[in-house]
């Protein structure tokens, strides 16, 4: 199923629809009609499903924070990045990893961060991290270790 999703199978499309509609529909037309916080929570639920299926001890999470745009990486025509690269982050805890990346954006000296912060705040982006933490998927606390 994981391999099939990588090549754009019907199963992958159905699963994306369920995430975007908070499992309230199987119709593509309904993808962007769900309550936004419910959509963010469904992303955390999907993460939990993968973690439970694969096994938490078998996953390492990596975030490559480069060419940071205000748009989702799933957008076919994203806005040009306004913020420079802030690094590559890795952890066995997906919640602390995402929290570290969010904090890195806020703490950056890059003046281009303003647009990204506005987008994260106006879309309540931190809610996925909050929901994942509430599901017990990890901790929002972390120790940042810089390498190199």
Regions found by a protein language model. Give the residues of each.
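Conserved phosphate- and dinucleotide-binding cores of soluble alpha/beta proteins
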Residues: 9, 15, 27-32
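Acidic, His- and aromatic-enriched active-site or binding-groove loops in soluble protein domains
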Residues: 16-20
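A conserved mid-domain beta-alpha-beta active-site/ligand-binding segment of alpha/beta enzyme cores
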Residues: 23
């Amino acid at each position: 199923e994981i391999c099939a999703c990588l090549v754009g199978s019907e199963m992958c499309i159905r699963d994306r629809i369920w995430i975007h509609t908070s499992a309230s529909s199987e119709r593509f037309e309904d993808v962007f009609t769900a309550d936004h916080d419910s959509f963010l929570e469904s992303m955390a639920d999907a993460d939990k499903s993968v973690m439970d299926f694969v096994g938490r001890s078998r996953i390492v999470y990596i975030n490559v924070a480069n060419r940071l745009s205000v748009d989702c990486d799933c957008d076919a025509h994203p806005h040009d990045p306004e913020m420079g690269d802030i690094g590559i982050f890795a952890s066995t805890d997906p919640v602390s990893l995402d929290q570290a990346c969010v904090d890195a954006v806020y703490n950056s000296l890059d003046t281009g961060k303003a647009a990204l912060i506005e987008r994260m705040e106006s879309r309540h982006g931190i809610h996925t991290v909050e929901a994942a933490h509430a599901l017990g998927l990890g901790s929002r606390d972390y120790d940042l270790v810089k390498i190199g």
